[in-house]
Amino acid sequence: MEDSDVERRVTAKVAWRFVPFLVLCYFVAYLDRVNVGFAKLTMDADVGLTDTMFGFGAGVFFLAYFLLEVPSNLALDRVGARRWIARIMFSWGLISGAMAFIPTIAARTGVSGEHTFYILRVLLGFAEAGFFPGVIFFLTLWFPAAYRARIIGYFMAAIPLSSALGSPVSASLLGLDGALGFKGWQWLFVAEAAPALVLALVTYFYLTDRPPDARWLETEERDWLVDRLAVENKARDSVSPASVLRSLYDPRVLAASLIYFGVVAALYGVGFWLPSIVKGFGVSIALTGWITAIPYAVGFVGMILWGLSSDSSMERIGHLSIALAIAAIGIGASAALDDPLLKMVALTFGAFGVFASLPIFWTLPTAILSGATAAAGIAAINSIGNLSGYFGPFVIGWIKDATGSFAWGLAAVAACPAAALIIALALGHDRALEKAPDGAHRV
């Protein structure tokens, strides 16, 4: 049988086994991470939060995430994805559920509701550290380079998908206010944390760490995949403690981290505050859920189509740059517009750019690094980039308290993908990226 037939069969088998399940896991992870944006619509009075306090608490998750990201991903490489990802999911499920009991915890410990909120967000960041880059690293162990943009795109589609579907659900859960003596925002945290605990158990038994362990592949299929990935990895750095350390100081890793910083600032800066922005239009909480879903639905489509376009042309930097430009223009325009309809059109335009950039961006680190160096490098990029997950929400909340408007906060966030665009164009002149296996990462 020709190699092309084996290739199609193997990639299809691996994709169908892992991608839908990992999309579901990330769907739950992202929902648990950002559902606080909807909870804010009714929890502020119960917990005692101003907009600045909420922005700080929403963002402090990422400071904790930053501290443990690289150690967590190195642990994944050592103990295996199956065990480590299951541990991560179980931990974040417990802590996300505990968010529902902030008033009770505060009353029994004597800690204020504000500081209890901060502490739980920090613990959630510690718990979830390593999940996203761990899955990205896991996918590089199973898919040849030519398939990674679309596969990563499918996986990352869980971000807009979770918000597009989760926004109306979150708004509906807020409507359970008073049921069994719980507030609506408490139901929101409990209901959306439970799936993580279930999926943690399933993950432990379902994932396979590496291709040589894949008994569900035929011998011919397994051998082809192992050999193909070995050929690709041979062209990159050998794995050693020194090469892992070098990856953390590689200028390209730093550049990629700064690009991701700009993307994440837009993703979470707008994401955490979008329910509040929409609620400010004077609509009901239920309608807020449906309107909030629109930018994410468009972002979902953009992510899939843009990843396919990038793979079909084998071109990365151009696609990434266009997406970043769209993100900056859309979010920047939303800051200048007061009309609710026009503001939502601009935010939807910006969401397309933000989400379309993500799968393209994540092909770049694996063009540079492999093995444990990839685990460390990907984690470093993700953790440094995710620091803007603190910057975006906090700056918008602080400016909102100071000015009474979201306009200047949105303008500040729009500057981040604009800066990322400049760095991406500069990175495009790095000719080392042209030599990625099979031209899959040609820029």
Identify the residue ranges that each predicted region occupies:
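Cytoplasmic membrane-interface "Motif A"-like loop-to-helix N-cap segments
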Residues: 78-89, 311-324
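Extracytoplasmic gate region of multi-pass secondary transporters
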Residues: 36-37, 246-304, 358, 362, ...
